[in-house]
Amino acid sequence: MPKRVLQGVVVSDKQDKTIVVKVERRFTHPVMKKTVRRSKNYHAHDENNAAKVGQTVFIEESRPFSKLKTWRLVEGEARDVAATEA
């Protein structure tokens, strides 16, 4: 089975070799028929401490690194949101 890959924004990089990534999903509400946004935070392993707050990154499923970390940063995929908007 292929590993899931999610795209999100780094909201914290204060921990050593760990980042917190906010992943947003959109879906249509079954009754109201309105597009709803829901977000969830994932702890991901960042071996080289490469990702910084505000960057858009891709994370993929992996073996458990700790109690909360079961995702890892996909190398070479970090993109700075502030630089692309300016």
Curated annotation (Swiss-Prot):
InterPro entries linked: NA-bd_OB-fold, Ribosomal_uS17, Ribosomal_uS17_bact/chlr
Which keywords appear in this protein's UniProt record, sorted alphabetically? Ribonucleoprotein, Ribosomal protein, RNA-binding, rRNA-binding
The GO molecular function terms of this record are: rRNA binding; structural constituent of ribosome
Q: Name the SUPFAM superfamilies for this protein.
A: Nucleic acid-binding proteins
**Can you supply one Gene Ontology CC term for this chain's record?**
cytosolic small ribosomal subunit
Q: What does this protein do?
A: One of the primary rRNA binding proteins, it binds specifically to the 5'-end of 16S ribosomal RNA.
The record's similarity note reads: Belongs to the universal ribosomal protein uS17 family.
Q: What is this protein called?
A: Small ribosomal subunit protein uS17
Phylogenetic lineage: Bacteria, Pseudomonadati, Pseudomonadota, Alphaproteobacteria, Hyphomicrobiales
